[in-house]
Every structure is written in C-alpha cells, then in structure tokens.
C-alpha cells in the first residue's frame, strides 16, 4: 500500500492540535537558542511577550557604520520564534555575510493572536528602531549596539514565507509615517506567503508538495486570518482585494526584491505580487530560481549562500541609487 500524500491530514502534517479554547498545541518545534556573544534580546512589548533579537557581525571594521536589516521569520503565522534554531542561525550567518546589524522580530502567533496582530508587532518594531535613532537627538538614549555603529539611513526590511507577507503589510502601514532619521531603502520578500480561494497553477501542480501541501496552507490561512473571512481577504490576496487606498500606498514602496523557487507551490503568487507592484510603479527586482523548494535556504547551504549573495547585491544597488523617488519611507 502506498503511503498517503503529506496533505492527507493537515493537522498531523503540521504537528498541531486545535484546542477547544481556540489555542494550539504545537507538538514539535525547532529548538530555541539563547543569545550568544554576537546577539542579544531587547524587550519590545512586555504585555505581548514580544522582543527583538539583535545580531551583529563577528568582525566589524573600526569606525564603520553598518546598515540595518529588520527581519521577520517564517512559520505560516502559527509556528516558530525569532529564537528558533534555523532562524537564529540564518540571522547569525546573514549578519556576518552582509556586514549588517540584524533585528529579528519576535511577533505574536495565530490563532491565539490572529492577524493583524503580527503586523501590529512588526510596526511596533519599526517604530522602536525610529525611537532608538531619535534618542540621542532628543536627549535620550540609544541601544549601545546601535548608537555608534549603524547608519540609520540604510535600513532594509526582510522576511521569509509568512515573514515576507509581513514585509508587504508592514510597508503598507508605515509608508506614510515619518520614520526619520531611519530611511527604509528596500524591501526583501523571500518566498512570501500569499494565498487565495482559487488555486494558482503552481499550487495545483504541487498540491501534494512535501513542504507546503495545499491543504496545509489552507489550514494555515484558516488559523491566522480574522474570523469569518476567506483566503481572498486583503491580508492573503492583495491582488484581488486591494482597494484604492492600498494601491495608492503600494505605489510609494521603496525598491523591492522578490525571491522564489520553482518547486515552491507559492511561487505563482509571488510572481503575481511582483507584477502588481511593478504595475504601481515600484522598482522591483526578482530572482526566481528554477530549482529549490519552500524554505530550502534553511536546509541547503548552497541555496543559503545564493540567497545571501542576491540580498547583498540588492542592498548595494539600493545604496548606490538611493530610495525610489516615489517612496516616502
């Protein structure tokens, strides 16, 4: 007898149980790692138990002013943490490879905290960074790792999977906010998690994918979206559901990098988002690798290296040209 496809029981596939009170029991998780000499945790909102894990490169040239990368981890909005081993290790490597200070954000998870909770936490992290930058100007204080060693005018916002979705949605929320002296030079959406009621071609073709089977992604959306809405909600399907206000705001996004892989069921959604942003006048760079699967950079060192190289080149191009002329960020 053949083994059932990975999508036959999405709860079992995701190793979760939905409890009667609406909370989740998460049966298996990545181990959580404590901060190291090159990282530390800063409380963000103690009521919400959110924090920022800051990573710095091992070898920082003297008198250098490093760029800042705000990072949002993946996990379908319901799993994992900024302290989860794969994301901690990835941020450690990125800080070294990119010579960048990385702020990895611990945001609230669904279904205990449905969207837009994660977006609100993301905005709070961006505003925290702004307040840190303004501290010395206003006679206040600034975190010691940020005070003298960063260039607040070279900030990037990056996320993977659900974190990529957060990047898009936090950009909508802060595009009209005065963040000075912080300047967001670019957005980086890596394998961003978007959806819709009607399956895309890649979702249909890869419906039994071993990483993102279609029934599992449907379950993720049912657990994270606001009660009573479907997958065409604007949080998951901005192409179908964005109104005039969202379209106007996305037209003021800074330069944006969208990265994806041909073996990811979500890849068509990512392509569609890229085209949507281009249609609003955003400078969009895309890298879609024929090979690879969802989250492959967490398991394949060569894919991780290629991703870091792509991100590094994008950051350098943003720094040399400056932010998009249509961006207020």
From Swiss-Prot:
The active site is at residues 161, 264, 294. GO terms for molecular function: carboxylesterase activity. It catalyses: a carboxylic ester + H2O = an alcohol + a carboxylate + H(+). Disulfide bonds: none annotated. Expressed in leaves, stems, flowers and siliques. Transmembrane segments: none annotated. It is an enzyme of class 3 (hydrolase). The keyword Ion transport does not apply. The keyword ATP-binding does not apply. InterPro entries: AB_hydrolase_3, AB_hydrolase_fold, Carboxylest/Gibb_receptor, Lipase_GDXG_HIS_AS. A motif (Involved in the stabilization of the negatively charged intermediate by the formation of the oxyanion hole) lies at residues 73-75. Keywords: Hydrolase, Serine esterase. Its EC number is 3.1.1.1. It holds the Pfam family Abhydrolase_3. Carboxylesterase acting on esters with varying acyl chain length. Belongs to the 'GDXG' lipolytic enzyme family. This is Probable carboxylesterase 8. It comes from Arabidopsis thaliana (Mouse-ear cress). The lineage of its organism: Eukaryota, Viridiplantae, Streptophyta, Embryophyta, Tracheophyta. The gene is CXE8.
């Amino acid at each position: 007898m053949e083994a059932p496809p990975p999508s036959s029981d999405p709860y079992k596939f995701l190793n979760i149980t939905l409890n009667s009170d609406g909370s989740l029991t998460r049966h298996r998780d990545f181990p959580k790692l404590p901060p190291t000499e090159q990282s530390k945790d800063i409380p963000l909102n103690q009521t919400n138990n959110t924090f920022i894990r800051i990573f710095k490169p091992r070898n920082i040239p003297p008198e250098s002013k490093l760029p800042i990368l705000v990072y949002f981890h993946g996990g379908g909005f319901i799993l994992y943490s900024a302290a989860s081993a794969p994301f901690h290790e990835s941020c450690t490597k990125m800080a070294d490879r990119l010579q960048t200070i990385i702020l990895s954000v611990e945001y609230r998870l669904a279904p205990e905290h449905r969207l837009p909770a994660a977006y609100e936490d993301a905005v709070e992290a961006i505003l925290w960074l702004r307040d840190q930058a303004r501290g010395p100007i206003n006679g206040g204080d600034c975190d010691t790792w940020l005070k003298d060693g960063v260039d607040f005018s070279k900030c990037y916002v990056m996320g993977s999977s659900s974190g990529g979705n957060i990047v898009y949605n936090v950009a909508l929320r802060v595009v009209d906010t005065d963040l000075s002296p912080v300047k967001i030079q670019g957005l980086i959406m890596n394998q961003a998690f978007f959806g819709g009621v009607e399956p895309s071609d890649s979702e249909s073709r890869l419906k039994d994918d071993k990483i993102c089977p279609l029934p599992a992604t449907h379950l993720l959306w049912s657990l994270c979206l606001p009660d009573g809405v479907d997958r065409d909600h604007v949080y998951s399907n901005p192409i179908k559901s964005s109104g005039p206000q969202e379209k106007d705001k996305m037209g003021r996004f800074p330069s944006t990098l969208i990265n994806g892989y041909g073996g990811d069921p979500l890849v068509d959604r990512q392509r569609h988002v890229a085209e949507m942003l281009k249609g609003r006048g955003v400078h969009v760079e895309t890298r879609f690798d024929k090979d690879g699967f969802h989250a492959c950079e967490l398991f394949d060192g060569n894919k991780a290296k290629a991703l870091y190289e792509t991100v590094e080149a994008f950051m350098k191009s943003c720094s040399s040209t400056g932010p998009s002329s249509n961006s207020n960020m």
